[in-house]
Design a protein with these regions (language model features):
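Glycine-rich, acidic loop regions that bind phosphate or pyrophosphate groups
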Residues: 1-62, 209, 235
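Glycine/aspartate-rich loop-and-adjacent alpha/beta segment that forms the canonical ThDP
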Residues: 2-7, 198, 228-270
Length: 270
């Protein structure tokens, strides 16, 4: 899933080196000067070996700005919990080689932007097909494939309800996972898009069950975050349990439009 070349190459005057497993498609805004087709891992290593070091500081500046953004709300105690704070606490509570399976919704926008990854396949997001409901069964699969690692399903309340019955599977097979539910009683991403495009929302709110009692009905542990400072210890305790834990975490999505406004002021130069 990528932006069409006409959005980032309107001038059509740049030199483009195409590095992919397949040949480039013909496009007026994507006229390549060189194609490196093959295993991307090996291709990048070979290209890196023959290129000259980049002396510019643009990437360093970008990296520093991202780090600043990631750290901005680390000590924020407002409630409901800001998306940035949830991600900070989650990243801090988990080891770097633990695994996150991210569902689809407003939380996916925040996770893909701000969740720091140091190892391959430690943050898996359904981005192409954008399949709501992937997080819980995906976390079960990840734990089966990597029983030595902690696994967390990060999901919105809507995505969680689409496949939450798979808690039964996890309990029956004794698969210990953590399910972190970002609770806003809404289709958060659709609400975000409606606010951006129309300045209002329509038919996106719904009523949730009691997620704590719902988890307990399967024999799992259910915990509700009632103060922001509770989130970190709740996460750590959940990661240490040898069973399924569902964490109901109210999220403050008033941050969404602030992010939209900030991103609208950015300009990418290539």
């Amino acid at each position: 899933v990528e932006y069409h070349p006409y959005l980032w190459h309107p001038s059509r005057d740049r030199t483009i080196v195409h590095i992919d497993t397949t040949h480039a498609e013909v496009d007026g805004h994507y006229s390549i000067s060189l194609a490196v087709v093959g295993n991307i891992r090996h291709s990048l290593n070979r290209v890196a070996a023959i290129t000259t070091p980049h002396q510019g500081k643009a990437m360093r500046t970008l990296r520093d700005s991202l780090i600043t953004e990631m750290n901005m709300h680390r000590d924020d105690l407002e409630f409901p919990v800001k998306p940035q704070k949830i991600i900070w606490d989650l990243r801090t509570a988990m080891d770097l080689q633990d695994i996150v399976i991210c569902d689809v919704g407003a939380h996916k926008m925040w996770m893909s932007r701000m969740f720091r990854c140091e190892y391959p396949n430690t943050c898996i997001i359904s981005n192409g097909f954008a399949s709501m409901g992937i997080a819980v069964p995906g976390a079960i699969a990840a734990k089966l494939a990597n029983p030595q690692r902690k696994v967390v399903a990060v999901t919105g309340d809507a995505g969680f309800l689409m496949n939450s019955q798979e808690i039964e599977t996890a309990m029956r097979l004794n698969i210990a996972i953590v399910i972190l539910v970002w609770n806003d009683a809404s289709y958060g991403l659709i609400e975000w898009k409606q606010q951006n495009q129309f300045g209002r929302t329509s038919h996106v709110q719904f009523t949730n069950p009691d997620f704590v009692q719902y988890a307990q009905s399967f024999g799992a542990v259910g915990v509700r975050v009632e103060e922001t400072e509770q989130l970190m210890p709740i996460l750590k305790e959940a990661l240490d349990r040898n069973t399924v834990t569902v964490i109901d975490c109210p999220v403050d999505y008033r941050e969404n439009l602030k992010l939209t406004e900030a991103l609208g002021q950015l300009t990418l130069t290539i």
